[in-house]
Amino acid sequence: MAPGPSNWLRFFWTTSSWALRTACAVHVIKADIYDCNETRGESMLTTLQAYGDYVHELKKYKLGRGVEMGDLVVMSKPTDPDSRVCKRITGMPGDMILVDPSSSSELTYSPRDRETNEGFNRFVEVPKGHVWVTGDNLCLSMDSRSFQAVPMGLIKGKIVAANSPMKGFFNEDEKFSFLNFKWLENNFTDDS
């Protein structure tokens, strides 16, 4: 005997209900708990590959809650809010920051720039509620040197791990590593 219309209707509603619940759960997890995204760009070399690494991001650090100097964060790009970027926090509120350490010599400044930038070094204080972020690969990074201090409200999460599935099952030391998974720890040391 063929199922009646009420059985098909019940099946449709049950399936739709579970699909909607699953979609809501996935949305909540990605928005508020955890997300995983592929890297694109060379600004974080050598910590992360330009392409093919997947970063694991904890959302409990959203809006800058609990972030520290040296943490890797995912944030909305200040010049394009629809884009996400990965950067390292190199200055916290109240810190005095050398804007561009890579250009702190007389070889990189023209005579006119030397006059307007107080010699070779230009320092700024990170305002309250902001952080200073830079890429690990300074020569290929668009970061706070370009768009100044970033509001903590743009921070979407903290990167805690990465993996490189394209590299196979062994890391650089020829040791087994599931999809080249690695924890990314904060390696900042305070020299003061």
Residue map of PLM features:
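Protein maturation boundaries and topogenic segments
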Residues: 1-86, 104-105, 148-192
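Acidic, glycine-rich loop-and-strand cores that form catalytic or ligand-binding grooves
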Residues: 90-107
